Amino acid sequence: MIEMVSRGEQAPCMTSRSSWSLGKLALWASLVPFLLLMRPYGGLFQDARIYIGRGVADLDPGGVGRDMMFAHDEQSRFSIMRAVVRSLLAVLTPAEVSMLLALAGILLWLVAAAALARSLARGRAAWAAVVCVLVLPAQYGAFGVFSYAEAIATPRIFAEAAVLGGLAALLSGHRLRGLMLLGAAMGFHPLMALPGLGVAALLLVRDDRRWLIPLGAACATILAAAALRLPLFDRLLVPMDTAWLTILRRAEYLFPSRWPAAVLSTFAYRLAAVAVAGSLSAPRVGAFLWGTAGVAVLGTLASLLFGDIVPSVLITQLQLWRWLWLLGLVGNASMALAAIGLWRRGPAGHFTLSLLALTFLSSAAPSLSMVLAAATVAWHVADLRGASPILSRRVVVVAASAAVAVAIADLWCDGAALSLLVRSAEAQGGPITWAQISSVGLQTIPLVAAAVASALIPWRMVPSSARFAGAASLAAALVAGILLWDSRTTERLSIEHRDGAAELRTLIGDTPGEILWIDEQSEAWFFAARPAFFNAVQGGPILFSRELAVQWADRAATLLRLHLVRPEDVAPWADPSRRSDELVVRPAAVRAFCADPSHPAAVVAPGEQLAAAPPGWTVNLWRPPAPTRRFFVDGAGLYWRTIGVFTVIRCLPSEAVQSPAPHA
């Protein structure tokens, strides 16, 4: 059994402060280098643009605030993040707010994750569990859209921290503290808090069946509110209309029926790890682990049935499949707990451990991974019941050798991928960041193996020289983490510092209106201080606003017809590869775009495309202080597209624009 604190059903982390020695403090502090290295900061990008952009829009209602995404915002009112960002923007720049929130978020998350780990196991077993949580794949759902513990300025990271802290408190017997933290999670991000509430409900009912009364009353109240058509709750019984659903289908990650089979591999190893670790833990911990898996499975099935096949507006918007985030974290922690517990069970446990390792390593073959997961659980259950056959040493060695061989092959593939990345970057002048290097995953297997081994080897058996080497390595890792955590490129730094922004705004002119920045990544908001006519970021919140979805889709159709965006800019999940060539803008397309009833102000096109301006229109070239470099997976290769100059075309007043239909 995994080493637990023996105190009945009480919290394994209930230890006195005096028990904290300098060694224990150093052990847990050593997680900081892992955090900094495994969660590098990429800048104001991804969903941070939504939340920081919301704050910028609040402070600039006549400018960025007119952007259609903020004008039809139905998302931010459910989170206190909007107020937090707006307050910080009063004294800091958007870039500074983004970095501050990202750093604060992951540090709070680490503290909460450590607290939860100490409620599941103790000592180095708990430490190894957190290491596995940090280094094993953190993605949940499909297409790598979401991960837990993201170092970006979103409310998700704070909600995750509050959920983990709340569950740790509940497992420790601190019920009020736990419920308060779960309430804080709801305040930051209700969707991320829901699985925590589900697991908390299971723990409370397990302790006292009388909790079924208030929980049942809460469910009945929700159903009654839906039946009475009260605001928000009425969406539960409203089917999503075809037009809105068709627009949303472009975001395939929202709908489990459209997920690739590779998702099953991740699901399989995490469920197998939870099943094994739960059986080796104290009853309360086992109930927590299995409850987490059950909540995740229930949420995914509900999302498939009522948010996908027969979609209800509310269930679709709740994205119940996102309950997988908690299973992802707990499943990765369970990999360490299961490995430690299985190793201590002798040959039969070693054989089960080999099967579990092969389940994880066979992620490229979903069918095989699922079979191995089932075999892992079946063999382990038989072993626990004493029904498994006695294995010869040769069988155990063969299974372990197979796992080691596959691990070596996996490392070789990761090394080849890293080599390809470096060689492609050198050949094309593309920037290489630590975030890109760490995302290859070359470090995953060695770090997991080292963490589990360190938890198994008695400390007294570790030579002093090895202890010194380990301490020196961690110190070096801390220095490296501090230096490498800020993984922003020169281009990203230039954009966030708004270098050259004044010159660009002069070229755009004073005419109010939206701008179309082709291939933009929210530069219109943070660089040009303008509302964007269209960008991919605006396509994220369309799930929460039908008006935004329709307007965004109409504009996407217009730009596709004018060849001012690519199909993959509108539906990136249909084909993850992207073309590395630049869009060629034509005068007829510019003229037709500028005739749009929304009265756009300008077009910013990549490259030197002076011929794109209709005769007599104002056109200029703008060179950013740092060239823009875009990374693409195009066909069979990796490519960087470097853009050193942009073409800025001012739109004429709408009454002066004639817009014949452009030829394809």
State what each model feature region is.
Residues 412, 483-496, 505-576, 580-583, ...:
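Short periplasmic/luminal acceptor-recognition loop of GT-C membrane glycosyltransferases, typified by
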Residues 20-24, 31-110, 116-133, 141-159, ...:
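Active-site lumenal/periplasmic loops and adjacent helix-entry segments of GT-C-fold
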Residues 14, 158-177:
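Membrane-interface transmembrane helices that cradle and orient dolichyl/undecaprenyl
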Residues 576, 582-664:
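Aromatic/acidic, Gly/Pro-rich catalytic loop(s) in extracytoplasmic/lumenal soluble domains
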Residues 299, 351-507, 512-521, 538:
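Transmembrane helical bundles and short interhelical boundary loops of multi-pass, membrane-embedded
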Residues 35-52, 59-77, 190, 194-196, ...:
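Transmembrane catalytic cores of multi-pass membrane glycosyltransferases
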Residues 167-169, 176-190, 196-203, 219-221, ...:
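Membrane-interface alpha helices of multi-pass inner-membrane proteins
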Residues 1-34, 456-475:
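Start-transfer (signal-anchor) and selected internal transmembrane alpha helices
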